[in-house]
C-alpha cells in the first residue's frame, strides 16, 4: 500500500479544538466538560444518533431546546459516504451546513457498519471490500479513505478506522482482530495528521471504491472553509472482544500511538450483558 506517513517532525497530532476537564468525582464516576470549537458539552452526555445527518422523528429545534439541550450528535460515516455522497456534502460546505446543525458533531469511522454486512464483505490488511446495501455496488473502505471522508464531513471528533469483531469470538481470533485494529489505528493517525496539516487533500469523487488512492507528493495549503484554526480531534478505539487481557493490551498500545481521546469499541455485539459491564468497569 502507498505510505501516507508524513515527515517525523510532523507526525504528532497538533493542537486540536478539543479539551476535557474533570470537575467532580465520586468513586469511579466523573463529571466534566468537553470544550469543542462549537461549544461546551457537559459529561456524561447522551449523544443522539443522526445516521444520515438527521435524528429520526425529532427536529433540530427540539434537540436544541432547553429540555433536551443536545450539545453533540453523531453522524454515520458509512451511510453519508454512500448517500448522499461526499461530493454533495462538500459542495454545501461540510456536514454542519448540509444539515443545518450548528453544535458539535462526532462521526464514526464506518467500521461497525461494515461489520454488520457479514455476508457481503471481505476484510484484508488494506481495508474492507463490501457491497453497498443500497445498490450492490462494490465499495472499498480503508483507514485512509475513512479519514478522508471524516475530514471532508468536518466533524469535531473523528474516529479511527477499526475492525469490530463479534463479542464471543475465541482468544486467537480476537487477538488477530485486535492487531489489525492497532495497525489500522496507526494508519488512521498518519492519514489524519497529513490531512489536517494540508499535506494531503481529500480526493473526493475520484474513484471511491476502486482501491487506495495515491498520496499527493507535493505539499498543499490548508483546506479552505475549515472550522477554525485548530484541527479536528481524532479518537482511538479499544478492541479485544470479551477477553480482558486483550482489552488491557489494546488500551496500552492505542494510548502509545497517541490520540485526542479513546473509545471502548466492540460492545453489545453478541456478548452477555454481565460481560459487557465487566469490560466497561475494567477498562
Q: What is the predicted function of each stretch?
A:
Residues 2, 16-198:
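Non-catalytic, usually N-terminal nucleic-acid engagement modules in DNA/RNA processing proteins
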Residues 1-15, 194-231:
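Intrinsic disorder/low-complexity segments
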Residues 69, 146, 202, 218-219, ...:
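Generic detector of short, well-ordered, non-transmembrane alpha-helical segments enriched
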Residues 154, 227, 258:
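Conserved functional loop/turn residues at catalytic and ligand-binding sites
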Residues 46, 118, 134, 212-218, ...:
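Residue-level recognition of conserved structural "scaffold" positions that shape functional pockets
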Residues 2, 195, 233-235, 239-283:
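Glycine-rich phosphate/ribose-binding loops and adjacent secondary-structure elements
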Residues 40, 51, 76, 86, ...:
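Gly/Ser/Thr-rich helix-start
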